[in-house]
């Protein structure tokens, strides 16, 4: 039954509502809407560079971020940021450790992850990647982290991604993985081959998960001013193939990447795009 209120009662209730001391009663027959939950992203390699910038940009846009890295104790900037931003949760994860991947996936089993962002990667020792110095151990290390680990992460977290609203798996790739641009690349066999393998692996993954409604994004962040980019440019200069494209800041790259992630649809899924140019990359 509804409550009949006189003028005094209405005035009193209005005052209490304004002070936040009472909540407005639900109207008869009108369900109270559930609070909207923020989208959730899990990022690998969140302690520095592009990963840390992605964490900040996503939080700015209202995302909850599960920020992972190998050693949070050494990630002071990330820990300080998380302490000031409740939307950030830090988790320890070495993406080359399958057991650690499965344990973290088990921890979040039953929880939705809108965007699984595979950002962690390495360049490897460039001096060991020249034709005269090739050896299998170094190649296996770079290939495992850059190409295999994102697939392993996708397998482990597929149920959480499939249960989400956005259903996105993102691979942070590189223009170095494009066969089209390979003639201009420096002598960095392991790194370039690993990124080409990542691109193909993600394209095959898209075929596998399309029936679940999952979208797989393959994206280059552009020439970002990070430690990896500095090492890449130094090696390129040594072999006489200097990189002349000006570098951009991690924050600028993160804005482009999040624009790409939020705008990812079926038309771009399984294809290689540049967040720097906003165009598809031939590969």
Regions found by a protein language model. Give the residues of each.
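Catalytic loop of short-chain dehydrogenase/reductase
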Residues: 122-123, 129-143, 162-211, 223
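Conserved Rossmann-fold cofactor-binding substructure of NAD(P)-dependent oxidoreductases
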Residues: 96-111
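C-terminal helical subdomain
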Residues: 211, 218, 233-283
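Short, flexible catalytic-loop segment of classical short-chain dehydrogenase/reductase
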Residues: 221-231
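Conserved glycine-rich Rossmann-like NAD(P)H-binding loop of the short-chain dehydrogenase/reductase
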Residues: 61-76
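Conserved glycine-rich cofactor-binding loop
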Residues: 47
């Amino acid at each position: 039954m509804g409550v009949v209120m006189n003028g005094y009662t209405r005035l009193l209730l209005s005052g209490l509502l304004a002070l936040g001391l009472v909540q407005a009663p639900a109207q008869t027959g009108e369900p109270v809407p559930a609070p909207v939950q923020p989208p959730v992203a899990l990022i690998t390699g969140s302690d520095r560079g592009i990963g840390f910038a992605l964490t900040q940009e996503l939080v700015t846009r209202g995302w909850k971020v599960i920020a992972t890295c190998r050693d949070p104790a050494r990630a002071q900037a990330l820990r300080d940021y998380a302490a000031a931003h409740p939307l950030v949760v830090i988790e320890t994860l070495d993406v080359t450790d399958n057991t650690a991947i499965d344990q973290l996936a088990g921890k979040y089993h039953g929880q939705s992850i809108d965007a699984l962002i595979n950002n962690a990667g390495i360049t490897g020792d460039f001096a060991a990647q020249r034709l005269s110095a090739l050896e299998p151990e170094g190649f296996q290390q770079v290939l495992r982290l850059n190409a295999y680990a994102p697939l392993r992460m996708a397998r482990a977290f597929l149920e959480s991604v499939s249960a989400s609203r956005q259903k996105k798996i993102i691979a942070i790739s590189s223009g170095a993985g494009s066969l089209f641009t390979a003639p201009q690349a420096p002598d960095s066999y392991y790194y370039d081959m690993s990124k080409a393998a990542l691109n193909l692996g993600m394209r095959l993954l898209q075929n596998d998960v399309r029936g679940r409604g999952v979208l797989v994004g393959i994206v280059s962040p552009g020439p970002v001013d990070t430690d990896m980019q500095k090492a890449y440019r130094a090696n390129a200069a040594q072999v006489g193939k200097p990189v002349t494209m000006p570098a951009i800041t991690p924050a600028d790259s993160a804005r482009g990447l999040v624009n790409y992630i939020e705008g990812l649809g079926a038309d771009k899924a399984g294809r290689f795009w540049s967040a720097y140019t906003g165009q598809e990359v031939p590969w």
